[in-house]
Amino acid sequence: KPDSQDICFVPDGDYGKFIEHFTGKTFESGNFMDVNGNVVGTHKNQIFYTVGQRRGLGVTFGKPVFVCGKNAAENTVILGENKDLMKTEILVRDVNLISVPELNEPFRGTAKLRYSQKAAPVTVYPNECGLRLVFDEPQRAPAAGQAAVIYDGDYVFGGGVIVSAK
């Protein structure tokens, strides 16, 4: 099954409309940017898009393009090719370690960024903000705000919230 970009409690999948309805706000349009920082179009507002999204962008480029990132402060959405979604390093905050009281040295295990994903080999490093996860193979479309769960074999080692990916 392909990765879902939907929120389970929004039945029609229009989470932008859902947010507008429940906040009572309307949101300003912004710019689509390419991965090089060039303006390539306009969008409804960054709240209407998720990292990894391909459909419903309202722009065409003659090749498949995906949402590769968002900047809420500047209301920009970054578009690129599938290869631009692939990231090997992820920073995680709000860490909850299950197997150890703290991590003082690198840990070798596996991690998942999505529930249905197969756990991927990773080296986990402590850092000043939480953890730095370095995957053996690039992972598709990790997004800020998503959970990262780290495993030691069949057991949960810990996890946290993704802050950024590169």
What residues fall within each predicted segment?
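Nucleotide-activated chemistry modules centered on ATP-dependent adenylation/adenylyltransferase
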Residues: 1-156, 161-166
